[in-house]
């Protein structure tokens, strides 16, 4: 068993394990979940909170799919196969991507779930406009994201041969890819409420 501390010096990462660790050894952050009245903070919130929100939908969904994918962070993954399966079994024309985005200059804690107008990829404007109008009508707090970088499983939907609209909707975190990822509980709550609302209205 290897247990050590991560040391950051500029752009370089080091460990303090007393001997050399074999190349290719997979290390992970020790989990330390902290929850107070405003935030949840832990390692690996990105992905886990997207899954949490999707699991909440399993309690109420009537018509639709709740799909859990793998390897999105590595580019590609299970989405192409799953899209083929879905479109053969019970086709859909719309997809909402439940995941976590980043705090940026234009996206802040406690201001609601983030609806992404674009990241590295651009969903169809007519669809994102409809989502924004519906969420405005709902009164659920939300904020808009316009970025040139980043991505999600929406990429696989966009590049698929199927005529499907998609939109990324998720809470934002800061201290990304660290053991201290941090998400507002209010934003997470609005994320779950928005998904429940949109599944009824779309």
Segments predicted by a language model, with ranges:
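N-terminal hydrophobic/helix-forming segments and targeting peptides
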Residues: 1-202
């Amino acid at each position: 068993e290897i247990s050590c501390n991560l040391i950051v010096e500029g752009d370089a990462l080091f460990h303090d394990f007393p001997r050399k660790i074999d190349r290719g050894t997979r290390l992970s952050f020790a989990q330390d979940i902290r929850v107070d009245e405003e935030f949840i903070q832990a390692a690996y919130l990105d992905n886990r909170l997207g899954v949490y929100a999707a699991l909440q939908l399993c309690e109420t969904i009537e018509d639709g799919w709740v799909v859990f994918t793998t390897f999105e962070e590595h580019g590609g993954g299970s989405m192409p196969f799953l899209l083929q399966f879905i479109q053969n079994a019970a086709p859909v024309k719309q997809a909402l991507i439940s995941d976590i985005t980043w705090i940026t200059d234009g996206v802040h804690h406690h201001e609601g779930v983030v609806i992404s107008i674009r990241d590295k990829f651009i969903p169809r404007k007519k669809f994102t406009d409809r989502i924004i109008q519906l969420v405005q009508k709902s009164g659920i707090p939300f904020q808009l994201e316009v970025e040139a970088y980043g991505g999600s499983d929406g990429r696989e939907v966009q590049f698929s041969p199927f005529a499907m609209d998609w939109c990324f909707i998720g809470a934002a975190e800061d201290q990304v890819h660290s053991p201290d990822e941090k998400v507002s509980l209010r934003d997470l709550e609005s994320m779950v409420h928005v998904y429940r609302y949109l599944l009824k209205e779309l």
